[in-house]
């Protein structure tokens, strides 16, 4: 198989990072935006000694795990790679990826990996966005890099961001603030439009307690899972109310 050759492939599994995996001429072949059970007509885009990579030309037979992505940029924007797969299957694949890592790296035959905790919301759950920004002859482009990592995809509305982030994006585009002079732009949810700039602390509530987070600091991205994550840590560590823990990053 050479680059630009065509082939038919059956996808068997999902690799870390979301690419589907099958075999062509006994070579492992990675296919972005595919799902286990897919039968695909693909074009070879990369050939290495131990693997191939291809892109989907046509879905001959779709996997029963496939769903229609909500995002209109999906497949072009490099921000997401699982939206075409049912959410329950996404969680199962991610659990298996952790199990495989323990088996291959730590040589643990049967790693005790728990089921992945499902998010109550699978869209509009992220409380922080790290956008790229660049100036063009038509104005400012704000969004994420494409799947190749070489081109900026201008994103008007991101379906995984909490809606107040999308509102801020609209205001910032219209205001043309000097904030865009940077290559990257961080926006947090629940901030007044245009006011989540550098130097401001962000308020976050966890288990009824208030935390002030630096604008350039780290905080758990999923707004709907933070409380459950803290509960899990307390339970597994057998902590009580008199203990102090630190979420260090």
Give residue ranges: language-model regions:
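Accessory RNA-recognition modules of RNA-modification enzymes
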Residues: 1-249
């Amino acid at each position: 198989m050479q680059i630009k050759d065509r082939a038919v492939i059956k996808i068997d599994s999902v690799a870390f990072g979301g690419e589907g995996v099958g075999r062509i001429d006994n070579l492992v072949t990675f296919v972005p935006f595919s799902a286990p059970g897919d039968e695909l007509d693909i074009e070879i885009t990369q050939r290495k000694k131990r693997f191939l990579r291809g892109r989907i030309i046509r879905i001959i037979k779709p996997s029963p795990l496939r769903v229609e992505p909500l995002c209109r940029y999906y497949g072009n924007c490099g921000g997401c790679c699982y939206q075409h797969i049912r959410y329950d299957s996404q969680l199962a694949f991610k659990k298996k990826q952790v199990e495989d890592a323990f088996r291959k790296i730590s040589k643990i035959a049967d790693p005790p990996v728990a089921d992945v905790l499902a998010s109550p919301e699978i869209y509009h759950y992220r409380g922080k966005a790290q956008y790229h920004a660049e100036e063009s002859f038509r104005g400012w482009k704000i969004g994420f890099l494409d799947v190749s990592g070489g081109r900026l995809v201008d994103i008007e509305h991101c379906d995984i961001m909490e809606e107040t982030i999308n509102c801020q994006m609209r205001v910032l585009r219209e205001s043309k603030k000097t904030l865009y002079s940077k290559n990257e732009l961080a926006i947090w949810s629940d901030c007044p439009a245009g006011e989540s700039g550098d130097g401001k602390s962000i308020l976050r509530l966890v288990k009824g307690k208030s935390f002030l987070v630096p604008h350039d600091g780290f905080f758990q991205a999923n707004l709907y899972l933070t409380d459950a994550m803290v509960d899990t840590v307390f339970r597994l560590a057998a902590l009580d109310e008199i203990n102090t823990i630190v979420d260090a990053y």
